[in-house]
Amino acid sequence: MNINVAELLNGNYILLLFVVLALGLCLGKLRLGSIQLGNSIGVLVVSLLLGQQHFSINTDALNLGFMLFIFCVGVEAGPNFFSIFFRDGKNYLMLALVMVGSALVIALGLGKLFGWDIGLTAGMLAGSMTSTPVLVGAGDTLHHSGMESRQLSLALDNLSLGYALTYLIGLVSLIVGARYLPKLQHQDLQTSAQQIARERGLDTDANRKVYLPVIRAYRVGPELVAWTDGKNLRELGIYRQTGCYIERIRRNGILANPDGDAVLQMGDEIALVGYPDAHARLDPSFRNGKEVFDRDLLDMRIVTEEVVVKNHNAVGKRLAQLKLTDHGCFLNRVIRSQIEMPIDDNVVLNKGDVLQVSGDARRVKTIADRIGFISIHSQVTDLLAFCAFFVIGLMIGMITFQFSTFSFGMGNAAGLLFAGIMLGFMRANHPTFGYIPQGALSMVKEFGLMVFMAGVGLSAGSGINNGLGAIGGQMLIAGLIVSLVPVVICFLFGAYVLRMNRALLFGAMMGARTCAPAMEIISDTARSNIPALGYAGTYAIANVLLTLAGTIIVMVWPGLG
């Protein structure tokens, strides 16, 4: 039996789509030195090659892919978007605006200089910024621009062509820039990170290994009684001195949960909760030959929960003001926008931040109720909320504003992005509403993006050879300029106008470019995770601004003549 693969793929859009995805994902795992191609460029290359052979796909699949991707970008940005927009994140907002705005202006200028159409110009901007949200926003706006069919088809083909030709240029140039730009300025990045660490009390905690607290029991002897000198637990400050917290006391056979007025007596058996290294550092009067095994005394359920910051008495407060240790709880991690932050007493909490807290189950529940809620440990997605807000986003995208002879429409990209932000924001405020496990959200987002990339590649593949010959050199030059010049402008603005700490500034610059590989290089150069504070500050707002940049560049292009 002979199987004609070409006819089989041309006759089955679903089969063609998943063949492109599978081959592209395999290609994306290849490395060029220390640089991995990545899923999006792998799928794009495979789809362009197959597109040259005149394979095509139903455009409805392409549209659904970009809609899912943009909606999920909004959901991820939602919990932190408004806090960054309205509060003390104004520096991060301004940095993101400078980065995206300067790239947009430069791309428009280069597009006019080289005589390109809007498709090539927007594609070059998206590729140079390694930003699929720009590509998606521009593609959606082109569909609603009112172009005639032939002109629209050419613009969409050029959009994906420009992206394909400049993506690797943008990625490699930014990674090289992240490695060498810190060395060209007069402040050492490691010194800047250490300065922030000293100012914020991170010298000991920033590199602390995270362990779960353990519970051990000790008998109070004469040495320990002498050590306490008749002071009650509040006056002793056991946690400040030892790093452990007295959770229970057995006295005369009776178990009790002590309060601050309790005084240790000879023969008491005490249960201490703390990290393993804290137990190891205990004064010898606690440890030497005095550890006991008491099943009832040690019968305690130590849990680790992810607590989402929500309540007004926690939002805007510093970590130190929560006084978790005073409530017998231990902080393991601080996560913002899927980025792990340094455990810094001076970090100001935003709504939607996630604190990983360990301690007795009752105490963790109490502290969670005080600052927010315990994240639902469920693998069940609230599909009703997901679908409802998706519909709302599409309806918002249909809104059109008429100004005399000029009409302006929101478009699906802006509508779905706004609806996604609202769903993410409401999820951060209502624990039982709109829950989407991070794994599920990432899968839908990645799948939507890959479907979109496959569609644009298959569509543009037939014209790539002509495009390479005519504009390849121009694209190389333009890609380098749009990738690196906004980074330099952003650095100058942050360093000399905002006067930001260099470690935070470089992290924020990589966040404004939404480039995780470059962020890793900055952290390695600083030998610290301090830059993650800046990265998280700009990342969420940059994703939104980049999507809007794709819309704006298409809208303003006709007016530039």
UniProtKB/Swiss-Prot annotation:
Transmembrane segments: 8-28, 32-52, 66-86, 94-114, 158-178, 383-403, 406-426, 451-471, 475-495, 540-560
Membrane topology, as annotated: Multi-pass membrane protein
UniProt record, GO biological process: potassium ion transport
A GO molecular-function descriptor: monoatomic cation transmembrane transporter activity
Location in the cell: Cell membrane
InterPro entries in the cross-refs: AAE_transporter (IPR050144), RCK_C (IPR006037), RCK_C_sf (IPR036721), Transp_YbjL_put (IPR023017), YidE_YbjL (IPR006512)
GO cellular component: plasma membrane
Disulphide linkage map: none
Keyword annotations from UniProtKB, A to Z: Cell membrane, Membrane, Repeat, Transmembrane, Transmembrane helix, Transport
PROSITE patterns for this protein: RCK_C (PS51202)
Domain RCK C-terminal, residue spans: 200-288, 292-373
PANTHER family reported for this sequence: K(+)_H(+) ANTIPORTER SUBUNIT KHTT, TRANSPORT PROTEIN YBJL-RELATED
NCBIfam families membership: PRK04972.1, YidE_YbjL_dupl
Family label: Belongs to the AAE transporter (TC 2.A.81) family. YbjL subfamily.
Protein name as it appears in the record: Putative transport protein YbjL
